Amino acid sequence: PRKGEYLLYDKRTGNMADHTLFQLPTALGKGILVTPTVHGNLLTGPTAVDIEEKDGVDTTKEGMDAVLAKAALSVPGIPKNQVITSFAGLRAHITKMPKGETAEDFLIGEAKDAPGFIDVAGMESPGLSCAPATGEYVAEMIIEMLKPEKKQDFTGTRKGIPNMALSSDEEKHELIRENPAYGNVICRCEMVTEGEILDAIRRPLGAVTTDGIKRRTRAGMGRCQSGFCNPKVVEILASELGVDEAEIRKAGTGSQYLMEGCGAGQLFAEPCQEEGEAHG
């Protein structure tokens, strides 16, 4: 896979670029870009490094230094101390093909050695921009393969989660009158309320992790990166899911915040004591 690292900056830097700035592309991609985000932050990256590990999404000092140096070529003076988080992602880059075939990008189609399995691999630039069209193309392939009956009562829209930060005063007052939880701000950086978090959990295919809450509501995406709101989000998740706070995870397996033995209600209490451990 090809690994790319990004840096995300605080919203106070969002006005340093009015639109996406690309550098001259290379064989590895479009290079380091500088772009404002739809939420007002500034984003720089990615690097492009071929690695062997399929789960190698760690961030590195070398990657950060490379992004900082190359982003400065497009926008000088981006303050390093305004970086609020860094992250990395992987792209399934095609490096080897069967004998007689050359490497390519945008490999989309039914695998020759696995009938019914559709490959969508080698998504090079502009893979993100063409993702909606790719999805429609693959959907048509599946329809052709399976010949399914069209669901006549299918509803293609769903009610979104209210965004209190972007709502008008009248809309906020109405929501709070209906449910006071919309007036209880949990994430102060992004002004996300308890009502929004509850909606994210209770909706079909609701959130079960703090990252799930983050993706649905932006709670934890602000300057403090969940340093303030995370304990309360864990508490709300545990209460709604009917589990101990020690079972709540950030994302995947092994990402629990609390050690076993720190039961519900212990998040704000004194550190758990191992059996037989004396108080100092």
Where are the language model's segments positioned?
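Short helix-loop capping/hinge motifs at secondary-structure junctions, enriched
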Residues: 13-18
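Short cysteine clusters
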Residues: 187-189, 224, 229
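Low-complexity, small/polar and acidic-rich linker and loop segments
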Residues: 242-274
